[in-house]
């Protein structure tokens, strides 16, 4: 994980630069594809995914080394052919894992976050899951295991394959001619993120679109059918942690409420979006219809609130980068504690931007707990001796958070008086 952390220190800034370029380009072209809080939500989601991976959260059900040990028939020598074969196997596995996520209720929960934005831009590519806590994806790499692809090769290619999917999350690139026949392009992926009936569950491939063409899931982007982005049941929140478990919580509620025992057992494995008839009738949920005007989620925010949200995002981003750069200095408990602090910080500031009634109290409590974390003798001694920069930064950040919350609270009270 230490190597992966160092790789991210280079990759993430590169992604952020590309996002800034896309924002500037959209501004000058008069075709802006970004909104303020949607972008912060996407970037925050990316941070939670990085933390989940770095902290090793999850349970591996079946690993690739296990499959390789028991299934390998061939033994490919190290060569360009080996790496090309391995990359094709990784892409093939990605297609079928992606298809499973789209088709089955339970697995959709861990993929919904990626489709949750009602925009389509490079930032939304960073909406990656933290709810994929069961490690079963290696099962789709059985062809690679049979061919004897070494685990080290898969370890190298897996992040390369993931990072290679970033560039095509954009509305600024049209169709790419002959490339459309064998590579996934922005046009094809716009289709994938759309909720238009003709586009639903189409274009599931990651790099090579031949899988979609062979297995019947390919759909070309049509001029007469502009893509509408998001999910059919809007998430209605900026909080990436809530989004990650929203669909799962809905299934838990349905399983509890339905009076039919077979439904309690099997609704998890039914097609995505399935709900028991008795529950669906008694507890209907909002679902988008393209026959009616669509109002995107965008709660009203004052300039002060936007400034406050951006301040928090900058500070949390700094904390994450400092954590990645000094990952080797942390013991496992300290890494979990600091990572947990970042998780809670993201949960808090995005909840306040949603306007939840409890969010102000939560944020105030988080800020005081953050101060306590850095002033507690055991922790303060560790940070002062090993990581003094983050120690002083933490004290300033959480102190300013408390002051900022008081100012926001005063603004809220003034607005209430004016409205009254």
Q: How would you label these PLM feature ranges?
A:
Residues 1-15:
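Hydrophobic transmembrane alpha-helical segments in integral membrane proteins
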Residues 20-40:
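Membrane-interface helix-loop junction between the first two transmembrane segments
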Residues 119-123, 167-309, 358, 394-420:
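Cytosolic/stromal cytosol-facing helical appendages immediately following the last transmembrane segment
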Residues 2-6, 56-75, 138-154, 315-334, ...:
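Juxtamembrane "helix exit" motif at the C-terminal ends of alpha-helical transmembrane segments
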Residues 44-56, 79-240:
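Membrane-embedded catalytic scaffold of the fatty acid hydroxylase/desaturase
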Residues 10, 33-50, 332-340:
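Loop-to-helix transition at the N-terminal end of transmembrane alpha-helices
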């Amino acid at each position: 994980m230490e190597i992966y952390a160092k790789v991210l220190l280079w990759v993430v800034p590169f992604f952020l630069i590309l996002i800034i370029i896309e924002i500037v380009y959209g501004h000058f072209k008069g075709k802006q594809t970004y909104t303020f809080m949607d972008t912060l939500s996407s970037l925050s989601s990316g941070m939670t995914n990085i933390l989940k991976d770095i902290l090793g959260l999850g349970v591996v059900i079946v690993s690739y080394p296990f499959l390789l040990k028991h299934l390998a028939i061939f033994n490919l020598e190290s060569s360009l052919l080996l790496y090309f074969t391995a990359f094709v196997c990784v892409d093939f596995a990605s297609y079928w894992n992606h298809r499973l996520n789209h088709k089955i209720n339970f697995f959709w929960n861990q993929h919904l976050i990626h489709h949750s934005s009602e925009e389509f831009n490079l930032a939304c590519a960073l909406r990656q899951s933290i709810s994929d806590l069961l490690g079963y994806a290696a099962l789709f790499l059985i062809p690679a295991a049979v061919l004897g692809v070494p685990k080290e090769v898969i370890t190298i290619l897996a992040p390369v394959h993931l990072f290679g999917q970033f560039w095509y999350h954009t509305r600024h690139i049209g169709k790419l001619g002959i490339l459309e026949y064998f590579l996934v392009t922005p046009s094809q992926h716009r289709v994938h993120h759309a909720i238009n009936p003709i586009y639903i569950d189409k274009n599931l491939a990651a790099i090579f679109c031949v899988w979609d063409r062979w297995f019947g899931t390919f759909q070309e982007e049509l001029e007469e059918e502009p893509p509408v982005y998001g999910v059919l049941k809007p998430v209605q929140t900026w909080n990436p942690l809530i989004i990650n478990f929203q669909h799962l919580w809905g299934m838990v509620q349905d399983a509890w409420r339905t009076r039919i025992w077979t439904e309690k057992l099997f609704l998890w494995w039914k097609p995505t979006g399935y709900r028991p008839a008795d529950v669906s009738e008694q507890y209907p949920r909002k679902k988008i219809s393209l026959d009616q005007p669509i109002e995107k989620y965008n709660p009203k925010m004052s300039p002060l609130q936007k400034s406050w949200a951006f301040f928090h995002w900058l500070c949390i981003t700094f904390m994450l980068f400092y954590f990645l750069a000094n990952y080797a200095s942390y013991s496992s408990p300290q890494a979990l504690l600091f990572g947990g602090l970042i998780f809670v910080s993201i949960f808090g500031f995005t909840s306040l931007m949603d306007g939840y009634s409890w969010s102000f109290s939560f944020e105030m409590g988080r800020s005081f707990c953050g101060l306590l974390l850095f002033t507690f003798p055991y922790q303060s001694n560790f940070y002062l001796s090993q990581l003094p920069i983050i120690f002083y930064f933490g004290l300033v950040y959480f102190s300013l958070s408390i002051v900022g919350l008081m100012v926001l609270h005063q603004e809220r009270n003034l607005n209430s008086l004016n409205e009254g």
